[in-house]
Amino acid sequence: MPVHGVIYYSSPSMATFLSPAQDNLVRTYFAQHLKKWVVQYKLYRNAVTPKTLEFLKQNINPSMLACVDEATMIDAEPELEDIIVRTKLWNFRQSFTIEGSIYEVGSFKVAIANVLQKSVWKGILFHVTYDGTESVDLARPIIQEFFLKCFLQNNKSVTPVYESFFNQPRHSLDSKLLLQLFKQRIDTVSQRT
């Protein structure tokens, strides 16, 4: 079972970081481009009650995840969102999009993507998967060293907003984890305003 490292930065100094990071990965580490990575998150508010409805779609996962509250998450067909919009019982509130690519470098799979709210840059997300061990304790320093060497060699002073290391059987990020990441982002924005 691979070990995953998810790291999210929102420092303005990293706003133009995606393209050079991808180029460096390919040129220096001979990374093989596997596919594009696109995630779309949408938040709706109930027109009558103070409830929220969230949708999450990934191009690497055919089903859509719908979440009415934190305890209830279901796999849904994309048509569900069309029905929600047409009934006008839910009002669109905001959306985030992750746009990037997935690469393979030896025992690592690396996904790098910009996080956008409409067209405004909100951060950069890194997802590193390591197949060398199943132990999170052993893999964490290996992933961190790989990450620093590949991406932050000249910019070590930037600190992540979110960092997590864990086991998961699949190589792609679980939709529920991405939903939690977006929730954290929304909560952080709400606290600032």
UniProtKB/Swiss-Prot annotation:
Keywords assigned by UniProt, alphabetized: Nucleus
Record GO terms (molecular function): transcription coactivator activity
One GO-annotated biological process of the protein: positive regulation of transcription initiation by RNA polymerase II
UniProt subunit comment: Component of the Mediator complex.
Name the record gives this protein: Mediator of RNA polymerase II transcription subunit 20
UniProt family annotation: Belongs to the Mediator complex subunit 20 family.
Purpose of the protein: Component of the Mediator complex, a coactivator involved in the regulated transcription of nearly all RNA polymerase II-dependent genes. Mediator functions as a bridge to convey information from gene-specific regulatory proteins to the basal RNA polymerase II transcription machinery. The Mediator complex, having a compact conformation in its free form, is recruited to promoters by direct interactions with regulatory proteins and serves for the assembly of a functional preinitiation complex with RNA polymerase II and the general transcription factors.
Coiled coil: none
Gene name, Swiss-Prot/TrEMBL: med20
Organism the protein comes from: Schizosaccharomyces pombe (strain 972 / ATCC 24843)
GO cellular component: mediator complex; nucleus
Localization, UniProt: Nucleus
